[in-house]
């Protein structure tokens, strides 16, 4: 069953069970591209925005109070996820996001009119009052981006950080061999090594919390090209204040609306911090899977949980699957960063027209990282243990302990001891005594692996 909807191009039939109107239907038919829906976070952000603009327009005497209340009620339904099925459009549409803006306008008007009566609320004249797609879509981008960071990504960073803190403390006095250039180096403790991973999380959280302030200023109030045509002079300030009340986030009105419409450097900047997190997560996961390599022919200093059979042909194999998953996510996020960077450069004249692909990739990065960090934490990090016997053996076998002799006998003599031990496949102690450079007592006094860690 269908109904007829109308816009400036004429009539078009729409599924009678759906709440969208003519412009949404045209977009649905004209842009059957891929299967990437406009992120629902953007729809919810639009609903927050439309609720705020309705309140401000009513306060300014432009919109009837009854209409503002009806619009706000529908917006609440959208935010609560009750109307998700009525937002069918894909990311691959107009670069300004106009069609998704109109999708939201049409659904709000349609549902509100079910209560007020047909034709009472118009999607353009009422729901979109004092607005343009050109300032609403970038505003929705910032609302959605900030909310996703606060509710999804930052909590997962904190949780992973806490697990690493626990592991760090547990193994702070377990001496192991350090490695630089993939070669043996001087000793440190496993706790010290893990503290480096922990600091990666701590610092990246700080980078994000600092950078995300850049997306608090909003474009709303700029309307079509940044001049604020058809909106009151302080409309942006009032809407930002209302959004702050609704969300609890300290949004402000961007001081330069021309910038806010044509540049997405704030989003690009914040995603740079997200990319940095992805880089460090790849480093941490790679360290763990290499240190857990084996069990008999690899490094084998760490043991990871056996979550599932590792091979379809080799029985008993345990693979570092969580490490592999999160490193693939990290690679995807790095690719997303390239896309965002290129798209952010396309602010021709007064408007960037790559907005949907920017926010799509931004939100995807957050979701993938948050999900993979949760999975990695629960299924790998929490069950990660040290193979203390293997670690002790490798410390005792290491030639790099000779570095501790440098202050006592000099670099060249210490190097000769290490070379002799390597060439004759003996222990460092045996080689040191054989050279006559040190006595057994001196060796035992000066070669103290725990002391070498400077704990």
From Swiss-Prot:
Keyword Transferase (UniProt): no
Record carries keyword Transit peptide: no
E.C. numbers: 4.2.1.2
Keywords noted in UniProt: Cytoplasm, Lyase, Tricarboxylic acid cycle
Gene Ontology cellular-component terms listed: cytoplasm
Binding-site list for substrate: 96-98, 122-125, 132-134, 180, 312, 317-319
Active site, renumbered: 181, 311
Disulfide bonds: none
Family: Belongs to the class-II fumarase/aspartase family. Fumarase subfamily.
Classification via PANTHER family: ASPARTATEAMMONIA/ARGININOSUCCINATE/ADENYLOSUCCINATE LYASE (PTHR11444), FUMARATE HYDRATASE, MITOCHONDRIAL (PTHR11444:SF1)
This protein's name: Fumarate hydratase class II
Source organism (scientific name): Listeria monocytogenes serovar 1/2a (strain ATCC BAA-679 / EGD-e)
Phylogenetic placement of the source organism: Bacteria, Bacillati, Bacillota, Bacilli, Bacillales
């Amino acid at each position: 069953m269908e109904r007829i909807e109308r816009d400036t191009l004429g009539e078009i039939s729409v599924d009678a069970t759906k709440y969208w109107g003519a412009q949404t239907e045209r977009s649905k038919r004209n842009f059957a591209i891929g299967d990437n829906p406009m992120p629902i976070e953007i729809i919810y952000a639009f609903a927050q925005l439309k609720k705020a603009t309705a309140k401000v327009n009513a306060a300014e005497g432009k919109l009837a109070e009854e209409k503002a209340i009806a619009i706000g009620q529908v917006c609440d339904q959208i935010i609560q996820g009750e109307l998700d099925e009525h937002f069918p459009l894909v990311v691959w549409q107009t670069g300004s996001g106009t069609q998704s803006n109109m999708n939201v306008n049409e659904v709000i008007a349609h549902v509100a009119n079910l209560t007020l009566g047909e034709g009472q609320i118009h999607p353009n004249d009422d729901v979109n009052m004092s607005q343009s797609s050109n300032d609403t879509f970038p505003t929705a981008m910032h609302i959605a981006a900030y909310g996703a960071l606060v509710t999804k990504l930052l909590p997962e960073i904190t949780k992973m950080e806490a697990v690493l803190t626990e592991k760090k403390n547990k193994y702070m006095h377990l001496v192991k061999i350090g490695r630089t250039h993939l070669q043996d180096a001087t000793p440190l403790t496993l706790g010290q090594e893990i503290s480096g991973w922990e600091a990666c999380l701590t610092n990246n959280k700080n980078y994000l919390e600092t950078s995300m302030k850049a997306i608090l200023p909003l474009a709303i109030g700029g309307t079509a090209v940044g001049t604020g045509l058809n909106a009151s002079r302080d409309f942006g300030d009032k809407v930002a204040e209302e959004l702050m009340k609704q969300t609890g986030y300290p949004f402000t009105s961007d001081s330069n609306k021309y910038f806010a419409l044509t540049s997405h450097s704030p989003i690009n900047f914040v995603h740079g911090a997200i990319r940095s997190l992805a880089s460090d997560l790849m480093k941490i996961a790679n360290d763990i899977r290499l240190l857990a390599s084996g069990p008999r022919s690899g490094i084998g200093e760490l043991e990871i949980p056996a979550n599932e059979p590792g091979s379809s042909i080799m029985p008993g194999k345990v693979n570092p699957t969580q490490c592999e998953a999160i490193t693939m996510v990290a690679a995807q996020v790095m690719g997303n960063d390239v896309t965002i960077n290129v798209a952010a450069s396309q602010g021709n004249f007064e408007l960037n027209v790559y907005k949907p692909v920017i926010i799509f990739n931004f939100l995807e990065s957050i979701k993938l990282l948050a999900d993979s960090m949760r999975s990695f934490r629960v299924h790998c990090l929490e069950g990660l243990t040290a193979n203390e016997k293997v670690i002790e053996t490798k410390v005792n076998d290491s030639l790099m302990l000779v570095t501790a002799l440098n202050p006592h006998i000099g670099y060249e003599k210490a190097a000769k001891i290490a070379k002799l031990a390597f060439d004759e496949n003996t222990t460092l102690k045996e080689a040191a005594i054989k050279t006559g450079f040190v006595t057994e007592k001196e060796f035992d006094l000066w070669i103290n692996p725990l002391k070498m860690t400077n704990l």
